[in-house]
Amino acid sequence: MSTTDLTSPAHAAVESAGTTAIAEDLLARVLEPYSYKGCRYLLDARYHADDDSVLAYGNFTISESAYIRSTGHFNAVELILCFNQLAYSAFAPAVANEEIPQLRGWSLEDYFQHQLASMFIRNSSSRFNRPINPAKFSARLQCRNLQVVQRTWRYLLVPCAIEFWDEDGGAASGEVELAALNIP
């Protein structure tokens, strides 16, 4: 999947109309590992899932970087942290509502048990087109063509594309391939 498959940020508000808000109590639970370290950046999120895809939108703020003094702009480490937060948050309600066939059989408790220990980034790439203001920015995540891979380890392959933008024209994007182990 290519980030060129994503819709432009100008259309994000229209597109997100078909999504459902993720409740703050669920976000708080999903993002607890980040809150624990003082780096919860995701403020709120919306999602939609079907048999073969997960779509999510999120709004973020990074008041203070978790690992370095402020650079004044959104950077590669923060891109991955924000990707993780939006992806974990989007998959949680999809698992709870049994919207992803390959994960049916997992309860929400199973999801939380596997969230950190069984989900991996297999590879990633990112592009930074214009600096993004970390104080207020948004993202769109699209994961498509989910498939179970049967090798030495059986896992769910999740190809994702993500884009970030701010109100001043800042823009960045990335492609991330996830692997979820210990699937039902």
Swiss-Prot record:
Keyword Lyase: yes
Catalytically driven reaction(s): a (3R)-3-[(carboxymethyl)amino]fatty acid + holo-[ACP] + H(+) = a (2E)-enoyl-[ACP] + glycine + H2O; (3R)-3-[(carboxylmethyl)amino]decanoate + holo-[ACP] + H(+) = (2E)-decenoyl-[ACP] + glycine + H2O
Description of the deletion phenotype: Deletion of the gene cluster mmaABCDE causes a significant decrease in the intracellular accumulation of zinc in Sauton's medium where metal concentrations are relatively low.
GO biological-process terms attached to the record: fatty acid metabolic process
A Pfam family it matches: FcoT
Keywords: Fatty acid metabolism, Lipid metabolism, Lyase
EC identifiers of the protein: 4.3.2.11
Top-level EC class as recorded in UniProt: lyase
Keyword Transmembrane helix in annotation: no
GO molecular function: lyase activity
Similarity comment: Belongs to the FcoT family.
Function: Involved in the biosynthesis of a unique class of isonitrile lipopeptides (INLPs) that seem to play a role in metal acquisition in M.marinum. Catalyzes a Michael addition of glycine to the beta-position of an alpha,beta-unsaturated fatty acyl-[ACP], producing a (3R)-3-[(carboxymethyl)amino]fatty acid. Acts on the (2E)-decenoyl moiety loaded on the acyl-carrier protein MmaB, forming the product (3R)-3-[(carboxymethyl)amino]decanoate released from MmaB.
This protein's name: (2E)-enoyl-[ACP] glycyltransferase
